[in-house]
Amino acid sequence: MKRHTRKIAIIGTGLVGSSCAYSIVNQGICEELLLIDINHERAVGEAMDLSHCINFTNTRTKVYAGSYEDCKDMDIVIITAGPAPKPGQSRLDTLGASAKIMESVVGGVMESGFDGIFLLASNPVDIITYQVWKLSGLPRNRVIGTGTSLDSSRLRTILSEMLHVDPRSIHGYSLGEHGDSQMVAWSHVTVGGKPILQILEEQKERFGEIDLDEIVEKTAKAGWEIYKRKGTTYYGIGNSLAYIASSIFNDDHRVIAVSAILDGEYGEYDICTGVPAIITRDGIREIVELNLTEDEESRFAKSNDILRDYMKTIGY
């Protein structure tokens, strides 16, 4: 019986790309992993290093360096290429440089005949995901950004430390921009199935000091707290990429907060922003529309308006 070989390409083998590749190899997410970088020798070195670690895993992944031409048969192309923000910059400040890089990258990939799924981590990821959708001409369900997947994970981690509950028992999402203007849909955050707002109301003596706005800010600024200490972040986002790729190949139907192009969902059109979505073998099967409160709707709309203002600077 013929079995389809799962193939992934990673474009950009810096710290994020190499961390993603390491996660993919260790988890055995695909059978072939192609690495592409403007510095080809770096991609070759990363491929060699990853190949040498495979004997210490329970997987067998073929890792090699190549070019855009090799993307033709890839199922997923992950793009991590792009400039890192400098001290004092926001992710949005890197837009101009990132957009120029995407024009070259997407053009090269599509010329190969690629017809799979794009998975983006390059910042500002929401706007870059929208740009890649426009440049590629692929259906909107097959162009996905990491969005607020990592932010939602950070939110659960912060809450778990405050509530002393395993983060995997906490469910909830950050929505909107993967950046400073993101918001949390508190009306849908649960701990063991119980609404967190109800828990805080019933247990004021234990949790009366918890400030929800402070948690939102702490979640949004978590990346910068890491940046101040070690210069950049890569493990979290690398694993987020691997997690989404795994969900695609396994057809898991997992709900993950990703950058998705909206066409009427949440009353929004022609914008890419962080929302929960069901991820399948075909990409985004469905965007999950949460019933937001009036205040949450306002915060979500404000975040999207900020994204729109920046989109205009690159012609969208």
From Swiss-Prot:
<feature type="binding site">
    <location>
        <position position="156"/>
    </location>
    <ligand>
        <name>beta-D-fructose 1,6-bisphosphate</name>
    </ligand>
</feature>
<feature type="binding site">
    <location>
        <position position="42"/>
    </location>
    <ligand>
        <name>NAD(+)</name>
    </ligand>
</feature>
<dbReference type="GO" id="GO:0006089">
    <property type="term" value="P:lactate metabolic process"/>
</dbReference>
<protein>
    <recommendedName>
        <fullName>L-lactate dehydrogenase 3</fullName>
        <ecNumber>1.1.1.27</ecNumber>
    </recommendedName>
</protein>
<dbReference type="InterPro" id="IPR015955">
    <property type="entry name" value="Lactate_DH/Glyco_Ohase_4_C"/>
</dbReference>
<dbReference type="InterPro" id="IPR022383">
    <property type="entry name" value="Lactate/malate_DH_C"/>
</dbReference>
<dbReference type="InterPro" id="IPR011304">
    <property type="entry name" value="L-lactate_DH"/>
</dbReference>
<dbReference type="InterPro" id="IPR001236">
    <property type="entry name" value="Lactate/malate_DH_N"/>
</dbReference>
<dbReference type="GO" id="GO:0005737">
    <property type="term" value="C:cytoplasm"/>
</dbReference>
<keyword id="KW-0520">NAD</keyword>
<feature type="binding site">
    <location>
        <begin position="123"/>
        <end position="126"/>
    </location>
    <ligand>
        <name>substrate</name>
    </ligand>
</feature>
<comment type="pathway">
    <text>Fermentation; pyruvate fermentation to lactate; (S)-lactate from pyruvate: step 1/1.</text>
</comment>
<feature type="binding site">
    <location>
        <position position="16"/>
    </location>
    <ligand>
        <name>NAD(+)</name>
    </ligand>
</feature>
<keyword id="KW-0560">Oxidoreductase</keyword>
<dbReference type="Pfam" id="PF02866">
    <property type="entry name" value="Ldh_1_C"/>
</dbReference>
<comment type="function">
    <text>Catalyzes the conversion of lactate to pyruvate.</text>
</comment>
<comment type="similarity">
    <text>Belongs to the LDH/MDH superfamily. LDH family.</text>
</comment>
<feature type="active site" description="Proton acceptor">
    <location>
        <position position="178"/>
    </location>
</feature>
<comment type="subunit">
    <text>Homotetramer.</text>
</comment>
<dbReference type="InterPro" id="IPR001557">
    <property type="entry name" value="L-lactate/malate_DH"/>
</dbReference>
<feature type="binding site">
    <location>
        <begin position="121"/>
        <end position="123"/>
    </location>
    <ligand>
        <name>NAD(+)</name>
    </ligand>
</feature>
<dbReference type="InterPro" id="IPR036291">
    <property type="entry name" value="NAD(P)-bd_dom_sf"/>
</dbReference>
<dbReference type="InterPro" id="IPR018177">
    <property type="entry name" value="L-lactate_DH_AS"/>
</dbReference>
<feature type="binding site">
    <location>
        <position position="146"/>
    </location>
    <ligand>
        <name>NAD(+)</name>
    </ligand>
</feature>
<feature type="binding site">
    <location>
        <position position="68"/>
    </location>
    <ligand>
        <name>NAD(+)</name>
    </ligand>
</feature>
<feature type="binding site">
    <location>
        <position position="171"/>
    </location>
    <ligand>
        <name>beta-D-fructose 1,6-bisphosphate</name>
    </ligand>
</feature>
<dbReference type="GO" id="GO:0004459">
    <property type="term" value="F:L-lactate dehydrogenase activity"/>
</dbReference>
<feature type="binding site">
    <location>
        <begin position="151"/>
        <end position="154"/>
    </location>
    <ligand>
        <name>substrate</name>
    </ligand>
</feature>
<dbReference type="Pfam" id="PF00056">
    <property type="entry name" value="Ldh_1_N"/>
</dbReference>
<feature type="binding site">
    <location>
        <position position="233"/>
    </location>
    <ligand>
        <name>substrate</name>
    </ligand>
</feature>
<keyword id="KW-0963">Cytoplasm</keyword>
<feature type="binding site">
    <location>
        <position position="91"/>
    </location>
    <ligand>
        <name>substrate</name>
    </ligand>
</feature>
<keyword id="KW-0021">Allosteric enzyme</keyword>
<dbReference type="GO" id="GO:0006096">
    <property type="term" value="P:glycolytic process"/>
</dbReference>
<feature type="binding site">
    <location>
        <position position="37"/>
    </location>
    <ligand>
        <name>NAD(+)</name>
    </ligand>
</feature>
<feature type="binding site">
    <location>
        <position position="104"/>
    </location>
    <ligand>
        <name>NAD(+)</name>
    </ligand>
</feature>
